[in-house]
Structures are given as structure tokens and as C-alpha cells.
Amino acid sequence: MRTKILTAAILALSAAGVQAAEKPLKILLVNDDGCQSVGTTSLQEKLAAKGYDVWMVAPATNQSGIGSAITFKTGKVFDVKKAADKRYCFPGTPADALDFGLWGVLKDAPPDLVISGVNDGPNTGMAQVNSGTVSAAARAVRYGFPAIAASIGYRFTEEEMKNKWPSTHKYWPDSGDYVVSLVDKLNAAHKPGSPIMPQGAGLSINYPPLPSAEIKGVHYIENEQFPVPQIGYELLADGTAKQTMNPEAMKPAEGDNDSGWLNKGYITYTLFDGSWNAPHYQAQFEALLGK
């Protein structure tokens, strides 16, 4: 009898181990385009269809360009809406949505991976600094979670601008499919108990708005360091200021940077750590300011 009980216990433990090994990858999706954005809702559906455990927490309204801003009001009650199963609309910024996802919805069962996007428009050059999409991913990395920011580019032609970027919206689903294929690749290489991506690093993907046959490949590249400013200001006689768009910023970027390679038809991979540290400049500052 004792042998039978011991055998049953071993089999039960073995079954539990198999279940643990087969536990689906848990993914938290966020964005800055809002909880109705098809770039993220469709990504949730596609990932869930592959068997992943996918949760989405996004701003209730479009928060594009809000960067890393947060709502800091302790005691405030937020009117969170549950839009669908595992999908929440949070009345705040992308960083707020991320925090609510990590420290609210999933606080007892954290995700294996955070994905921000797929964003409507590129996040290269200065746009990466402004981006709520990239900022949410960088915040996740700083917390210690593997994170991907995903965006689709623009074709900078007069026709595209006048018609509100039709190529971007046409190939938006393709960019989501690409992200799913990337998750599949990461998951296939993932060893249980270890991070799914290198610890402390995030990946910003920019996908060109082109048919797959015209995409030239993948190119790892740093974010453009000194981009043309997008915005200017005109000081008016009455003391007010009028914001203007710099026409130079609307021209297709060229050169050896993320904007240039995206515009050449490459999927760009830009790595980031979210640390805001630059210790390699210490010696230069010590020479200027002393120790």
C-alpha cells in the first residue's frame, strides 16, 4: 500500500511539473494610443489565439507624445473600465497604465513580458524621447521586466500626409503579425525560470509601412542622437506664442540612424536600458568640474 501511495505521489508531482512547464507565457500589453487602438487590441487577439496568456491595460484616451508622465495623487480613486476579458481602460498616462497593470491587475502573478504598442506611427529620432509607447516599455525595463516597444512607420510623401498615412494603417496588421512571430521566437528559446530577454535591456522595434516583399530585413541601430527638432514657436505681438511645425522634420531622414534605416525599408531594432545613466562621461565631467 505504501508503495502505491508513493507511486501516486510521484506521478502527481510529475504531472504538476508538466503543467508548470506548459504554463503559457504571460504578457502585459500597454500603449499610448488608448484602449480602443486596433494596434494593441488586435495584437492581444493574435497572441491569445497562439495560446499566450495576454492582458491589456491601456490609457482610456489617446495619450500620444506624453512621454513618461505619471499621475501622482495618493488616495485618488480611478474610474477603471473593464472593456473585455483581460482588457482594462485606465484613466491616465501610459506609465500609469503600466503601473496599474503591474502593481494592480497582475500584482500577484507578474508577466513574463511587457509589450507596448503596436504604435500608430514611428518612434525613431526625437519621437522616441517623446513617446509614451517607448517610455512605458523603458519603465517596465527599469522595474526589471523584459519589454518590447513596437511601432509602425510613416511614408513621408505629400499624398500620405494629406490622407492621414494610409500606408501605415494598411500595413498595421502586418506589424502585429511580426510582433507575434517575434514572441514565438523568444518563447521557443525561453528556459523556465530565466528571463525571456536579456535582463535589464529592452527592444524598440520600428516596422516600415510596406508590403512584406519590399522589406529589406532587420537592422540593429542606435536612436538618432541629434535629430532635427519637430516643433518651433513664433512669438506674437500680444505676448502669446504660436506653435509651428518644422518642415525639415517632415522630410524623410537619411543616414546611419534609426530614422534613416527605417525609411530605407528596414525593420529597425534599437536597444535601450531605461537607466538614464551615462557613467562613461564621468572622467570628462571630473576634468571640467573637479572630483
Which positions does each model-derived feature cover?
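Glycine-rich phosphate/pyrophosphate-binding loops
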Residues: V141-N163
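Conserved acidic residues
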Residues: D112-L113
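Gram-negative bacterial Sec-dependent N-terminal signal peptides
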Residues: M1-A20
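Alpha-helix C-terminal capping segments
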Residues: W103-D108, A137-P146
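Electrostatically charged, flexible surface regions
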Residues: P166-K291
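Charged helix-capping and loop-helix junction motifs
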Residues: V129-S135
